[in-house]
Amino acid sequence: MNRKISRGGKIIIYLVLLFVAFVMVVPFAWMILTAFKTQSESTQMNPFLIFPTAFRTEAFVQAWEELNFGRLYLNTFAMIFIRIITCVVTSDMAGYAFSRLKFKGSKFAFGLVLFQMMVPEQIFVIPQYLMLSKIHALNTIFSLCFPGLVSAFGVFLMRQAYMNMPRDLEDAARLDGCNIGQTFLFVMSPLTKSSKVALCIFTALFGYKELLWPMIANTDNNMTTLA
């Protein structure tokens, strides 16, 4: 049975929510307002100096020109775009293979995929760096994309998506004369669009916030990312 909350209880709940919202919003608002201050204003220890004396945009112009933000944005978006394409394509095919095709060593191979998900990504930094150094691919867009061209998480996600789909769809396609490739391309793969969208979002987020690898693989400031 639902219990009604008294008016006093609602007021307390609203006050707590307002306090939590205040704590979450104030640092973000402070950061934005500080960007419009002069250097002397931003370094003052006066907690009551919240708003700048005048809203100035010189800091934005200086940061854009000195740090070459245009090039950094281009590198970041190119890396994310390439990673999304390769991750979705490879994860889609591998996920379908692991969920539907019965081949020798499939369980062992999928176990390796799960094992890779449990290993910290920092362990792969040195081997990946040495591989790119051998082929002289450092300080390139390819070096930014390299660790995320395939995704163990993406393979696991797409496998689970195909595991939840009925086999009757494949049986019907087979009766219509479709082979395995046609069944995958024209019947099964279009039905996993929601999982692909989720994979695209995760891939973009992981790539955008990646900090360690771009610093190691690309020493040229014009070939790094926003992170």
Regions found by a protein language model. Give the residues of each.
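A structural signal for multi-pass alpha-helical bundles of membrane permease subunits
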Residues: 2-227
